Every structure is written in C-alpha cells, then in structure tokens.
Amino acid sequence: MRFLVLIFFIISCSENSSHYFPLDKIKIWSYSVEIIPEVENRALYKKTHLSMGKKKLSLNEEKKKLFPILRENGTTLFYEFLDDGIYRVGKKFLKEKEITTESKRMVLPVPLTPDKTWNVDSETYLILRKYPYYDYRATTNFKLNYKVASMKETVNTPSGTFKDCILIIGNGKTNFIGNNEIGSIGIKIYSKEWYSKTIGLIKMERIEETDTDMFGTTKMVQLLESYQKF
C-alpha cells in the first residue's frame, strides 16, 4: 500500500516536460527583450522563434527526430526529446548546409519535479562596454546550475496572464581575463525562466554581475508578446 501511495505521489508531483516546451503545438513565439546595463544605455529589441515541427534529420550521419527552431537572426537551433529530458543538440547558421553538433544541453529534465537540479554549459553575453570605434564584450564560458524552484507560478506578460507555470532558477560564476587595462573580472550569473504549460517559455530574467565599475551589472528581461499555434 505504501508503495502505491509513493507511486501516486511521484506521478502527481511530476509533469510531462514536453507540455512546457511544446515545439509541435506552437508555431511562433514573439518576445520583447530589454537590456538594462549599469554603465551603458538601455536597449530594447524584438526576438522571434519559429518552430518547424518534428523533422527526420541527419545528425552525425544518424537519422534522428529533431525539432528545428529558426531564430530572428537566421540561426536554427535543433532540439531532441529523450527519455531523461529535452536537449538542444545542434545549430546551423544562415548560410550553412550541415548541422553543427553541440554537446547536449538540457532545457528541461524528465520527470519534471520540484527541486530537480541539473547543470549546463553556458557563456556570458550581456557584459558590454562601448568605445568610439569598437564594442568590448566580456564573453567567457561557465557552468550554469539549474533548479526547479516552483511549479505554481502566476506570470503576467503582454500576451496575458499565465497560471501554474514552472520557475527554473539558475546561478553560476566565472572569471574573464581581459587585456592589460581590464585585467581579471569576477562575474556572477543569475537566471530565472518561467514556462507555461502548452505555451512554453513566457518570461526570462538574467543578471550578469561583475566586480568592477568598468562593466557593472547588466540585467535582461524577456517577455512573451504573442504566440501562434500550428
């Protein structure tokens, strides 16, 4: 009897990860993105993700069922649904013919349960200093540690209010070695991602905090503005 109760508890506390990353249900996601730096001017732009549905494609000379997502910059990202999670497995730039294989990067785990943890390879991309003739961007690799923090979030976006969302929090730290003027910079990274059942990613916040006044802290806020189903 206890065994049956335990099974019921596990099933009731877990969720189907594909519901929160419905690449076969939603065709287009449109987002607003605001970059809020401490030392530079704010920037606001739009981002669009276009799902091409499930495709049989060759990856490392092996046929796989993948989900391509075309981004607004012409880059296509490829996702694969496996038994233990949803992974990003490759990408292709605008003029390339072949898919570039990546180390598997977990987007959401299976099963999706409270306090579930995992880590992924990531890199900094918000830290920027503008000069008269060039932009200096502090980009470096690090490990981002993720955790399912909540499965009952209510989130307001320009596209509407979404209930029973999951919240994924992430954190990491790294060092960037710059030129003689900049030296070594300590960086802390904080991330929050909200996913709605049947819609997918609806909001994301990311903070990259440096230990120098030269770059300061930069925050990014991404909000779902609209979506279109297949």
Predicted regions mapped to residue ranges:
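Sec-dependent N-terminal signal peptides
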Residues: R2-S12
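Conserved functional acidic sites
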Residues: S14-F230
